[in-house]
Amino acid sequence: MGETVRFGVSLDEDLLNKFDKLCDRQGYPSRSEALRDMIRQALAKDILQSKDSNAAGVLSLVYDHHTRELSRKLIERQHEMYDSIIATLHIHLDRYNCLEVLIIKGNGGKIQQLADMLCSIRGVKLGAFSFLPVEEDVF
């Protein structure tokens, strides 16, 4: 990180009041820290727009393991892109539903494609993907 620089920001009073309430709810010690986090998130999002970015993420899938051929299809697709999958965790939520959590890393475009492919398999009830750039200059 570089040297901290002060700068001024002009805001509408109503917007500032809403921002202060947001900072309080989220437990920020100062407006500056909240603003730093928001800037980092915007930069991370911008980097992830690039198909060449390096990224890491978590993919969560909920599915009924009794759905015909679904477990096999999920495993086959994971093996097709084994080099992007670092780890998996399989949890039995109830008699029917399973939660599969995958830790993924690699090219941002490639892991987004993997997440989309797994989430779109027929029988997957819910899929959620969250990923972050691993470029050093974001942080």
Curated annotation (Swiss-Prot):
Return the similarity comment: Belongs to the transcriptional regulatory CopG/NikR family.
Q: Which residues form the signal peptide?
A: none
Q: Name the Gene3D superfamilies on file.
A: ACT-like. Chain A, domain 2, Met repressor-like
**What's the source species for this entry?**
Lawsonia intracellularis (strain PHE/MN1-00)
HAMAP family reported in the protein's UniProt record: NikR
The record lists Ni(2+) as bound by 79, 90, 92, 98
Q: Which cofactor does this sequence's record say it needs? A: Ni(2+)
Entry function: Transcriptional regulator.
GO MF annotation: an example: DNA binding
Source lineage: Bacteria, Pseudomonadati, Thermodesulfobacteriota, Desulfovibrionia, Desulfovibrionales
Name the InterPro entries for this protein: Acetolactate_synth/TF_NikR_C, ACT-like_dom_sf, Arc_rbn_hlx_hlx, CopG, CopG/NikR_regulator, Ni_resp_reg_NikR, Ribbon_hlx_hlx, TF_NikR_Ni-bd_C
Q: Name one GO biological process term.
A: response to nickel cation
Which key words are in the record? DNA-binding, Metal-binding, Nickel, Transcription, Transcription regulation
- Cofactor remark: Binds 1 nickel ion per subunit.
Among Pfam families, the record links this protein to: NikR_C, RHH_1
Classification via CDD domains: RHH_NikR_HicB-like (cd22231)
Write down what this protein is called: Putative nickel-responsive regulator
